[in-house]
Amino acid sequence: MGRGFLRGVLTLLPLRSVLQVQHCMLVSEPDLPPKRPRNNLMAPPRIGTHNGTFHCDEALACALLRLLPEYRNAEIVRTRDPEKLALCDIVVDVGGEYNPQRHRYDHHQRTFTETMSSLCPGKPWQTKLSSAGLVYLHFGHKLLAQLLGTSEEDSVVDTIYDKMYENFVEEVDAVDNGISQWAEGEPRYALTTTLSARVSRLNPTWNQPDQDTEAGFRRAMDLVQEEFLQRLNFYQHSWLPARALVEEALAQRFKVDSSGEIVELAKGGCPWKEHLYHLESELSPTVAITFVIYTDQAGQWRVQCVPKEPHSFQSRLPLPEPWRGLRDEALDQVSGIPGCIFVHASGFIGGHHTREGALNMARATLAQRTAPVPLANAVVQ
């Protein structure tokens, strides 16, 4: 799928204003590495970071830098020696200095309180930046443009820049700075397989005879780079094209059903929820979308209820309670719709052998409620 198509898709996305984007990029794009204070100017550039126990943020910061052409062959210098760090072209997560003009990106000093929002007005994220977030802020647009094969001015770059920060880099910033996801109370379950946790486990254990961290840090850089590129590939090749499908489905919804509350997706399995909420907020339909119908991988039809919120298990309008947990003939008899396959016990999704049957399941559910739900009353994020 060509970049021209993706640009067309992105013209409808709620982007920041041009001035905000230009300001952000002005703040966040440093020059190429300065001249190195070394005799051999042909030597590869040096990226400095601290030695000893390593963390996800500096591993990601170094990995992102080495994806750039000017740092692709860079030497990673792991030390806390100020004299050795002074010889580095760029220093991350050590040194007690944040100075983009000198390519110094530490966040541990008492005076450092910067966030994506404070350094890039117009961006909403207020999590204190780690070295990963600082490198991403200053080099992210350039890096993404290179990886996506487009220019930094392409609106696709700014859109994916935001998605990658919110859904990948910000988590690393928060974990490294000790910022909890919740304000108070005990967590209901443990999260032990996060990216930061997996990087941490690449350090030597306390009782290993060999406490050298160099090999582990190289593995950590490989790990975070692979996951960053996997996530980027998803947003470029799956998330963006899905928006076009959802937009077209919304435009055609009255041809599916006169209520305008049922959306039919041409291709099942695409990530539709986030796009649906965003498009609803832009288009402001008079009634909220209640159901989405689509085919599954087996070619059967699904009718899925739209959640009240993006990550909620509560539906705007669940399938009728008497149908829930039933299958096949038992469901046919209760619903009065032949060819049913199942309805989930919570009522959030059901299946049918045919498109018309799935549509009838949605219509029958709409007919049993008292009145349509105005979009203003539907919880939309």
From Swiss-Prot:
GO CC terms in record: cytoplasm; mitochondrial matrix; mitochondrion; nucleolus; nucleoplasm; nucleus
Entry keyword Nucleus: yes
Claim: Protease is one of the keywords in the record: no
S-S bonds: none
Record's subcellular location: Nucleus, Nucleoplasm; Mitochondrion matrix; Nucleus, Nucleolus
Keywords: Acetylation, Hydrolase, Mitochondrion, Nuclease, Nucleus, Transit peptide
Entry-annotated residues carrying N6-acetyllysine: K267, K273
GO molecular function, one term: 3'-5'-RNA exonuclease activity
Pfam families found in the cross-reference section: MYG1_exonuc (PF03690)
Entries under InterPro entries matching the protein: MYG1_exonuclease
Transit peptide start-stop: 1-47
Single GO BP term: rRNA processing
EC number(s) per entry: 3.1.-.-
Purpose of the protein: 3'-5' RNA exonuclease which cleaves in situ on specific transcripts in both nucleus and mitochondrion. Involved in regulating spatially segregated organellar RNA processing, acts as a coordinator of nucleo-mitochondrial crosstalk. In nucleolus, processes pre-ribosomal RNA involved in ribosome assembly and alters cytoplasmic translation. In mitochondrial matrix, processes 3'-termini of the mito-ribosomal and messenger RNAs and controls translation of mitochondrial proteins.
UniProt family annotation: Belongs to the MYG1 family.
Full protein name: MYG1 exonuclease
Species in which this protein is naturally found: Rattus norvegicus (Rat)
Lineage of source species: Eukaryota, Metazoa, Chordata, Craniata, Vertebrata
